[in-house]
């Protein structure tokens, strides 16, 4: 009886091996699902980037708006008759007087009289 129980237990383990660790086992399926989720996230990011680039390409091909915008912001160009005005934030004020030196009769200056 004990031998039969041991044999059944070993057979049960042999049957469970492919379910958990085999080529199509649960661990492999879990890993593939994780990879699929990560790839889906990367694909979505790339789709958004591609859509942005397609819009920019279409704008460059069809109109002069994008070219004019780049010329203004990247090259600092202005149209004829326009005046370029730039507002600069004021710099923080610096004190005109230098800091005072420490007093000559300080405790550190005494030689231990």
UniProtKB/Swiss-Prot annotation:
Segments traversing the membrane: 4-21
Transmembrane is among the record's keywords: yes
Keyword terms, alphabetized: Cell cycle, Cell division, Cell inner membrane, Cell membrane, Coiled coil, Membrane, Transmembrane, Transmembrane helix
Gene Ontology cellular component terms for the protein in this record: cell division site; cell septum; plasma membrane
Sequence ranges on the Cytoplasmic membrane side: 1-3
Listed Pfam families: DivIC
Record-level GO BP terms: FtsZ-dependent cytokinesis
Topological region Periplasmic: 22-113
Subcellular location: Cell inner membrane
Membrane topology (UniProt): Single-pass type II membrane protein
Family of the protein in this entry: Belongs to the FtsB family.
PANTHER family: CELL DIVISION PROTEIN FTSB (PTHR37485:SF1)
Name this polypeptide is given: Cell division protein FtsB
Organism of this sequence: Cupriavidus necator (strain ATCC 17699 / DSM 428 / KCTC 22496 / NCIMB 10442 / H16 / Stanier 337)
Gene name as annotated: ftsB
């Amino acid at each position: 009886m004990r031998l039969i129980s041991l044999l059944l237990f070993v057979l049960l383990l042999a049957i469970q091996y492919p379910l958990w660790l085999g080529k199509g086992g649960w661990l492999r399926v879990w890993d593939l699902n994780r990879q699929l989720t990560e790839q889906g996230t990367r694909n979505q990011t790339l789709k958004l980037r591609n859509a942005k680039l397609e819009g920019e390409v279409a704008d460059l091909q069809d109109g002069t708006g994008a070219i004019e915008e780049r010329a203004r912001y990247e090259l600092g160009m202005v149209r004829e008759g326009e005046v370029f005005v730039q507002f600069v934030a004021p710099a923080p004020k610096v004190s005109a007087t230098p800091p005072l030196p420490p007093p000559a009769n300080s405790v550190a200056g005494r030689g231990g009289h």
